[in-house]
Amino acid sequence: ATKSSAVYRLRDRVNALVDGICWKFTQSDGQEVACSHAGFCSSWVRKLWSPSEGLDKLVEKTNNMLLKDGNHSMGKLSTAGRERGGFGCPSPCWAGEHELRAEGIKGFTQIVGHSAQNTVVKSKTVNNDVLWFCDTHSWLTNTTRGDDSFLMYDDNTNKYTVLKPY
């Protein structure tokens, strides 16, 4: 098998494990990491969650909104901020890159998609928390954007690596 086909098989296996719109893991150094479609902004989570509850609770509450609450919670999950043409608090379905930098949840690393990039990008929030932008396979205005790279975390070394399929 080629390196490219191995990368795609790995991506497919990871996709099969993810259930819901977000999940979390803890790095080997104890840092908690939130993984979601578009990212968590403090203005959106403020009414739903307190950092004292822990990241597990935010993930649980957000996924329950999608998987259990159904249409009752779809309005909350669908809110878009000004960056995406809306007027509400940016939800984890619609948060934009600039909104995350300005108001990403404090104290947590975030790994997100949704904001198209040419390659995986590491950034920081105004609170100096790490943001990884990983949407590298988008289709915009009849052209593709991105190099299909993705992010891998190694808990033995506590390091992230950007993998490219070719």
Listing of model-derived features with the role each one plays in the protein:
Residues 122-166:
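Binuclear metal-dependent phosphoesterase catalytic core
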Residues 15, 63-64, 71-73, 118, ...:
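Detector for Asparagine
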Residues 1-103:
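Active-site-proximal loop/helix segment associated with metal-binding centers of metalloenzymes
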Residues 35-36, 110-115, 133-136:
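Active-site neighborhood of phospho(di)ester-bond hydrolases with catalytic His/Asp-centered motifs
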Residues 41-43, 101-102, 111-123, 139-142:
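Active-site environment of divalent metal-dependent phosphoester hydrolases
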